[in-house]
UniProtKB/Swiss-Prot annotation:
Keywords, comma-separated and alphabetical: Aspartyl protease, Cell inner membrane, Cell membrane, Hydrolase, Membrane, Protease, Transmembrane, Transmembrane helix
Catalysed reaction, written as an equation: Release of signal peptides from bacterial membrane prolipoproteins. Hydrolyzes -Xaa-Yaa-Zaa-|-(S,diacylglyceryl)Cys-, in which Xaa is hydrophobic (preferably Leu), and Yaa (Ala or Ser) and Zaa (Gly or Ala) have small, neutral side chains
A Pfam family hit: Peptidase_A8
KW Magnesium (keyword) present: no
List of catalytic residues: D113, D130
This protein's encoding gene: lspA
Record-given protein name: Lipoprotein signal peptidase
Protein function: This protein specifically catalyzes the removal of signal peptides from prolipoproteins.
Length: 156
């Protein structure tokens, strides 16, 4: 595969995998799958806000803000290709998760959440997309830290 297209393949591969996994788990949740354990429960909640239900006062208008942010990020990444080439998998994961949550907003009126961590403390209910967004941000930060360290080592 040509080097110039490899990053696009990685981006869309990560995008599709994260989107499909998140929607599959959400479909199981909507079909009634429930599970309880000492640490984590699989339940159902419809989040009309963003993280920790913030901005829920925007109600149905939040989906348009969400859509605008995703479109702006897509345009920026494909216009400024260096960032996309460097972090293609992470941005694919992030945008696949974001589009999956956006689809929920248009279809269900909010984001379908299902995981409830309750060992030691009660954490907000979250979904696969939320986890993937956090992992993608961590990947970008780790790559940037190591890139900076390599650059600093070369300067010594």
């Amino acid at each position: 595969m040509a080097k110039t297209f490899k990053f696009i393949f990685y981006f869309w591969g990560a995008f599709v995998l994260v989107f499909a996994l998140d929607q599959w788990v959400k479909s199981l949740t909507l079909a009634g799958l429930r599970w309880q354990s000492e640490y984590l429960d699989l339940t159902y909640a419809l989040n009309t806000g963003v993280a920790f239900s913030m901005l829920s006062f925007l109600e149905h208008n939040l989906k348009y803000l969400h859509l605008a942010l995703i479109v702006v990020l897509f345009i920026y990444l494909f216009w400024q290709k260096t960032l996309l080439k460097t972090h293609s998998i992470a941005f694919g994961m992030m945008l696949g998760a974001g589009v999956s949550n956006l689809l929920d907003r248009f279809i269900h009126g909010g984001v379908v959440d299902m995981f409830f961590w309750h060992k030691w403390f009660n954490f907000a209910i979250f979904n696969v997309a939320d986890v993937m967004i956090n992992i993608s941000v961590a990947l970008i930060l780790i790559q940037e830290i190591f890139k900076k360290r390599k650059k600093d080592d070369r300067m010594d």
